[in-house]
């Protein structure tokens, strides 16, 4: 398992995850490569969740030559992935390669950039659309957003998820890059969530962007800059 437990989050340390993130950070990485990189990173993170949080069971297997015993991952039918539009779309595409039978939810959420960041480091959040599947007590819920900056968007999203879910097996908040400020805000607001990230960066700038970060993941993936 390549997940390192930190006080503020669980850090995914897989070599391919770090390699892919480094390419995503590079300003020279163009749109198609950036989008494919987010897909790849989502797939790697999905495999890490399977390896670190899911159990296996022994099953009989008939090979072409004889019967033997194999292992299957338990709970792959009991996964709910929440896509925080829009930047998470390619990230979630990768997660679905690891969890092809997962149910999907969608929440469209974004900062009110015109209002700006408050003195306590939060943004007003606008949520335009929410569509969630049934969340059952046996489900593993993964809320995916590649950037966890101030944590304002994620906290607003988690409010909706928790309103719909009376119980669940596990709740993961998954990001590619996180700021320390956002990790603290989310962990204090939703202590039952397990925070997973590939990198914990230095800080937020005065506009609430992660430094060094990788820029605006949505703009780079969808070429809206």
Swiss-Prot record:
Pfam families: UPRTase. Its EC number is 2.4.2.9. Allosterically activated by GTP. InterPro entries: PRibTrfase_dom (IPR000836), PRTase-like (IPR029057), Upp_A (IPR034331), Ura_phspho_trans (IPR005765). 5-phospho-alpha-D-ribose 1-diphosphate binds at residues 86, 111, 145-153, 216. One of its GO terms (molecular function) is GTP binding. The keyword Ligase does not apply. The keyword Protein biosynthesis does not apply. Uracil binds at residues 210, 215-217. Belongs to the UPRTase family. This is Uracil phosphoribosyltransferase. It comes from Halorubrum lacusprofundi (strain ATCC 49239 / DSM 5036 / JCM 8891 / ACAM 34). The lineage of its organism: Archaea, Methanobacteriati, Methanobacteriota, Stenosarchaea group, Halobacteria.
């Amino acid at each position: 398992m390549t997940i390192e437990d930190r006080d503020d989050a669980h850090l995914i340390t897989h070599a391919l995850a770090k390699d892919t993130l480094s390419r995503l950070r590079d300003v020279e990485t163009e749109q198609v490569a950036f989008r494919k990189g987010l897909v790849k990173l989502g797939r790697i993170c999905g495999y890490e969740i399977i390896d670190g949080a899911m159990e296996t069971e022994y099953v009989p297997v008939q090979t072409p030559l004889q019967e033997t015993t194999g292992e299957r991952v338990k709970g792959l039918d009991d996964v709910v992935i929440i896509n925080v539009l829009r930047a998470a779309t390619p990230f979630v595409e990768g997660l679905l390669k690891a969890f092809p039978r997962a149910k999907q939810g969608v929440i469209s959420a974004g900062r009110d950039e015109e209002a700006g960041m408050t003195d306590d480091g939060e943004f007003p959040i606008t949520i335009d659309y929410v569509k969630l599947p049934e969340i059952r007590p046996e489900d593993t819920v993964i809320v995916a957003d590649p950037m966890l900056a101030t944590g304002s968007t994620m906290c607003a999203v988690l409010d909706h998820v928790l309103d719909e879910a009376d119980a669940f097996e596990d709740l993961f908040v998954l990001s590619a890059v996180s700021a320390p400020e956002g990790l603290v805000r989310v962990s204090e607001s939703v202590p039952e969530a397990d925070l997973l990230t590939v990198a914990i960066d230095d800080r937020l700038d005065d506009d609430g962007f992660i430094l060094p970060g990788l820029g605006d993941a949505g703009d780079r993936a969808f070429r809206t800059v």
